[in-house]
Amino acid sequence: GLTGTIPKDEYEAVGCICSIGPVVGNLSSKELQDMGVLADLDINILQLQDGVLGFSSYAQELKWLVTDPKRIDQISNIVKGLSNSGNTLVLIDRIATGEMLMERNPDWVFISGEMKTTDRQKEYDEVSDANNKIIVATYGVAAVGINIPRIFNLVLLEPGKSFVRVIQSIGRGIRKASDKDYLQVIDLTSNLKYSKRHMSKRKEYYKEQNFRHTMTKVEYK
């Protein structure tokens, strides 16, 4: 196997090297962008103002963040606002989130591990010709090296603090196409305790990778 993302944690990095061998070369995403291999990008962190809710664990908080109906309505509106600027890939953690988004937007496509591989590939292939297609996919599916270069907008819903997940997720959209050399990334996060901590960690990764990023607080009802 091959990977372009070596984990930051030593025990994970050692496991990776034991499985596929030593690192044979090291080029950062910024270097590949400067060489014209990868698309340029901007990351817009949208911090939804979810009030002062308190949860005793990250799992409880995350469940609320990705299934609360009013929050899903807001997320749906944000994604729809991007649709006229090109194909959009929305990455989510829970199947329940995808189902809720599809209830509101039946013309979108939802891809999860439950979908047959051939059906998944058919949807990916359609992006080659489509212009305003919206694909919702779980992080687990997207982690398996999908190749869909004509993604112009990438939405990350509560991606957490895993270096590999965050960087690999961005990698799904940063590939160039004949009519694409720029990617807009929307990092959807919250002002709640655990989400806020994870967002701070992601900002460190963005800074390390020299990815331009800004943060905007978003009020909603």
What spans do the regions from the language model cover?
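Short glycine-/polar-rich loops that comprise or flank the Walker A/P-loop
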Residues: 12, 20-23, 38-42, 149-153, ...
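Short, high-confidence coil segments that cap the C-terminus of an alpha-helix
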Residues: 84-86, 131-132, 151
